[in-house]
Amino acid sequence: MDWSRKKVLVTGGASFISSHLIDHLVAKGARAIRVVDDLSSGRLTNVQGHVESGVVEFHQADLLAPGVPQRMVEGVDVVFHLAAIHGGRGFVDLHQAACAQNLALDGILIKAAYEARVEKFVFASSGCVYPNHLQTDVRQELYLTEEMVGPPYDADNLYGWAKLMAEMTLRAYARDFGFRSASCRFFTVYGERGVENHAVIAMIARAFVRQNPFEVWGDGTQIRNWTYVGDIVRGMVLAAERIDDGTAINLGTEERTRVIDAVREVLRYTGQEAEIRFLPHMPTGPL
C-alpha cells in the first residue's frame, strides 16, 4: 500500500498507542492524516509536531455526537479505529456502564465508514474478547490463539463484549457487503507516552516515588503478555495492508510473564528494596 496516496483517519489519535501509530504511518510516507480525539485521555502534545508540520489535521470532537462520525470519515481511504472509553483494570471493572457506550461508538463508526466507501477499516480490539473460563488456572501454560474465540462466548466484562461485538460486526460487513477490514487484538501494551493508570507505567511510577510497601493487585500470579507499542503499531499497519475479510489477529508475543516477576524486575532496575504487599481484593481480570 502506498501510504503517500492515502487519506487516513485515526480515531482516538492523540492517545498513547494512536500517536505511535501516526509516527509509524508518517515514517511510511503518509502525508494526509485526520485525527479525531475528545482529549478525555489523549494529549494533543502527543501529535503536536505532526499538526505543526501539516501532516495531521486535528479535530477535538466526540464521536458519539450526532454527525461527527459521518464528517470524520468523509473523503477517507483508511480508518484506524482506536477511540474507546477505556482505562486500566480498575476502570473497566468499576465503570461497566461507561464501557458499554463503546458498543454504540463502534457500530456507528463502522456504518459511517461503509457508507462513505472507506477502502479499509482497522479496528483496535483486545485480549478481553477471550473466554474467561479458559483463563482461571495459573498453573496451566495457556497460549490464547485466535480460534479460541467462539461459542460459547465469554468475554471479559462489558469492555470485552463491546470489542467482540465490533469484531463480529466487521466480519458481517465483510461477508454481506464486501467491506474490507481487520481487527487487531491488543494485550498489555507498554512504551513511551504510556499513561499512568496502565500496569507498567504505574509500577515504574510507584518504584520511582519509593512506595514501601510496594502494592500489587491480586496475588501476583496473574500472567500477562507485555507487548511493546512499536510492535503493536507495525502489526496494525501490516493488517491494513494484508487482511481484507474482517479476520481478527493477536498482536502480542508468546512470552508469558507473571505480574510478580515484572514487579521484581522494576524494583531491581530502579534499585529499590521494598516489602511487597499483595491486595487480593483488588480487580485483576483473568489469571
Positions of the model-derived regions?
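C-terminal substrate-binding subdomain of Rossmann-fold SDR/epimerase-dehydratase oxidoreductases
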Residues: K28, A61, V209-L287
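Residue-level signal for the nucleotide or nucleotide-sugar donor/cofactor binding architecture
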Residues: L64, Q101-A104, N157, G194, ...
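N-terminal Rossmann-like NAD(P)+-binding domain of SDR-like oxidoreductases, especially those catalyzing
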Residues: M1-V189
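Residues in well-ordered alpha-helical elements
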Residues: G67-Q70, D77, N197, I201, ...
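CheY-like receiver
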Residues: R71-M72, A112, R206, G235, ...
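A glycine/serine/threonine-rich, flexible loop-to-helix segment
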Residues: T136-V138, E196-R206
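Hydrophobic alpha-helix immediately C-terminal to the catalytic Tyr-X-X-X-Lys motif of short-chain
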Residues: M165, T169, Y173, M203, ...
